[in-house]
């Protein structure tokens, strides 16, 4: 059972890979359009210079990809600790898969309808799942 906790990490890796592919399949055509319009892309080499240059849909995909390198890094670390200490149980598995599902739906919402309150709700629910993993492991590792 312990190794099953690693599957959600692989799922998140696949989600990140899919978002990377979407980012490049939207950004490269948009960059070619800008270049054809005479925009010097080299002057946009820093992310802070890109704000508002690309269409919103293109930016949302890139933003989502970047988001997958923020909060999920804590998820990866916590899951690895759970696995390394052999603490995997049903609650950990449910929370880890809930986290993955919520982050996946969050990604879909962000790159499509981008409804702010729905995204925020999904983000907060994913934090509940992550906090469940984190604090159960803190108790298991330090208190018991």
Which residues does each predicted region cover?
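N-terminal signal-anchor transmembrane alpha helix
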Residues: 3-44
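Hydrophobic alpha-helical transmembrane segments of multipass integral membrane proteins
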Residues: 10-21, 71-74, 97-104, 124-135
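Short membrane-interface loop/juxtamembrane segments of multi-pass integral membrane proteins
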Residues: 43-65
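Core segments of transmembrane alpha-helices
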Residues: 66-81
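Short alpha-helical packing/oligomerization segments
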Residues: 77-99
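Alpha-helical transmembrane segments of multipass membrane proteins
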Residues: 80-84, 104-108, 138
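Interfacial loop-to-transmembrane junctions
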Residues: 105-129
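Juxtamembrane boundary at the C-terminal end of a transmembrane helix
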Residues: 133-144
């Amino acid at each position: 059972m312990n190794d099953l906790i690693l599957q959600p990490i692989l799922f998140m890796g696949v989600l990140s890979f899919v978002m990377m592919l979407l980012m490049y399949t939207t950004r490269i055509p948009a960059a070619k359009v800008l270049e054809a319009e005479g925009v010097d892309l080299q002057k946009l080499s820093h992310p802070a210079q890109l704000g508002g240059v690309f269409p919103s849909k293109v930016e949302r995909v890139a933003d989502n990809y970047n988001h997958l390198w923020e909060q999920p890094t804590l998820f990866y670390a916590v899951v690895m600790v759970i696995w390394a200490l052999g603490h995997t149980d049903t609650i950990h598995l449910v929370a880890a898969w809930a986290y993955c599902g919520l982050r996946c739906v969050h990604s879909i919402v962000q790159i499509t309808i981008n409804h702010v309150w729905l995204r925020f709700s999904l983000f907060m629910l994913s934090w509940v799942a992550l906090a469940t993993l984190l604090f159960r492991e803190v108790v298991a590792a330090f208190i018991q």
